[in-house]
A protein has these predicted regions:
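Surface-exposed loop and turn segments in beta-propeller and other repeat-based domains
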Residues: 89-91, 157-175, 257-294, 386-397
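Short loop/turn segments immediately following beta-strands, especially the blade-tip
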Residues: 25-30, 75-82, 145-155, 203-209, ...
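Loop/turn-rich, solvent-exposed surfaces of beta-rich toroidal or solenoidal domains
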Residues: 294-329, 337-359
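Asp-box/WD-like beta-propeller blade repeats and closely related beta-sheet repeat scaffolds
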Residues: 83-181
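Short coil/turn segments that connect the beta-strands within blades of beta-propeller domains
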Residues: 1, 50-51, 105-107, 187-188, ...
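Conserved beta-strand positions in repeat-built beta-propeller and related beta-rich domains
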Residues: 5-8, 15-16, 55-59, 65-66, ...
Length: 397
């Protein structure tokens, strides 16, 4: 079994750039062993498809020109020993690319460009009163579609869709503008979680063009961050408040079925889930989301194994957790949460056989392996851990 770990190599926000690139590990059921470390620029998210690995380069100046955008890279995977070698790279045609995924037919690569929370272009313009006032222009947030060459390398850009708008906490808290965070595919449909706008955009792609067919409204202020698709169901994890929604897919479009907690019930006695009945907060409204109040939990990633749903929660004032939910009759049932030896769990994954859970703790720079109960899929014990500075995402094959 091989584990591929992306990392944060350049400090940004609360994240320290202690990583060097992509690290390859092996796991024999008992021990993790480091096999290879390949230097790359901010390969924060990675995905493995057979003998090819793709990663985002989550920066604003991938070409060396400040503000020119991030990048996306492709690697060949040696199936014999698990090692990797870069075969191509491209600009991502946007700032801070946050996710990469390959189409089901293997012919296209989709990349979401998140955009920066803080870096803006400032212009002073004259208003109707003849006064010069500051106008702040944020980075575009977009989804880019690339061709995939026969050898798996990244081909030409085929389409780029820029999404505008803002979310409930539009006066701060990371929702002043659109921020596409995650992209997933199912057949001819493309789904993007827009944590800056509280929406999920649904596209089809035909003749190398993307077409928007639905803008699914999520709970105002909740900031959809990650999603997983399992058959006819989609699980959407929110970043601003610890909750996960279950949607049903019908002809590619999303229809809400249920919403569930991702933390112990005692947490919500102190921090109940809010309900906002308008798309934008008042300017003087106190921001209660996790981006503004660090005492609150901030969900980070989601992984689905059969009917079991795993969620990681960042808790900067105490300790991070992994929570287990179960889907039953189109409902989500919270089962348990497990404390982690760190505050900032990022990527994680369940092994294909469902026996192990791998968790990346970004703040401590360690990867942990936990054994799962074969029947309940609850965490049984820690099996091993290993040092991996700045680790931010995992792929287990």
């Amino acid at each position: 079994m091989y584990i591929y770990a992306g990392s944060i190599t350049e400090s940004t926000g609360s994240l320290k750039g202690s990583g060097k690139g992509i690290t390859v590990f092996s796991f024999d059921g008992e021990h993790l062993q480091k096999l290879q470390e390949v230097e790359d620029v901010q390969p924060s998210i990675l995905k493995v498809y057979g003998d090819r690995l793709y990663c985002t380069n989550e920066v604003k100046d991938f070409t060396g020109l400040n503000g020119s955008g991030g990048g996306v890279s492709a690697y060949a995977v040696n199936k014999t020993d698990g090692t990797i070698q870069k075969i191509s790279q491209s600009i991502s045609y946007g700032s801070r690319p946050s996710y990469v995924v390959k189409s089901d037919d293997g012919k296209h690569l989709f990349v979401t460009n998140h955009g920066s929370h803080t870096t803006v272009t400032c212009h002073y313009i004259k208003n109707n009163l003849g006064q010069f006032v500051l106008e702040r222009q944020f980075d575009d947030s977009s989804v880019a579609m690339f061709a995939v060459q026969k050898d798996g390398s990244i081909g030409n850009l085929q389409d780029l869709q820029v999404i505008h708008g803002s979310g409930y906490w539009c006066h701060g808290g990371g929702q002043s503008t659109s921020h596409l965070h995650c992209v997933k595919t199912k057949g001819e449909y493309i789904y993007t979680c827009n944590r800056g706008k509280d929406t999920i955009e649904v596209f089809t792609y035909k003749n190398n063009r993307l077409q928007l067919i639905q803008e699914c409204q999520c709970p105002y202020g909740y900031a959809p961050r990650h999603m997983e698709i399992l058959g006819e169901y989609t699980f959407v994890l929110y970043e601003n408040y610890p909750a996960v929604s279950l949607f049903q897919l019908k002809q590619g479009k999303l229809y809400a079925l249920d919403i569930s907690i991702t933390m112990p019930k005692t947490y919500y006695d102190v921090y109940p889930l809010p309900h906002f009945d308008k798309p934008h907060a008042d300017k003087e409204e106190i921001n209660t989301c996790g981006m503004a109040d660090k005492r609150r939990a901030m969900p980070s990633d989601i992984h689905v194994f059969k009917e079991y749903v795993y969620v990681s929660n960042r808790c900067f004032s105490s300790f991070g957790t992994v929570s287990l939910l179960k889907m039953e009759k189109e409902k989500l049932a919270y089962t348990a949460s497990y404390a982690l030896p760190g505050k900032d769990p990022r990527g994680f994954a369940v092994s294909k056989d469902g026996n192990y859970l791998f968790v990346a703790l970004c703040d401590t720079g360690k990867i942990y392996v936990y054994a799962l109960d074969p029947l309940t899929k609850e965490i049984v014990k820690e099996v091993d851990h290993i040092y991996c500075p700045g680790v931010s995402s995992l792929a287990v094959v």
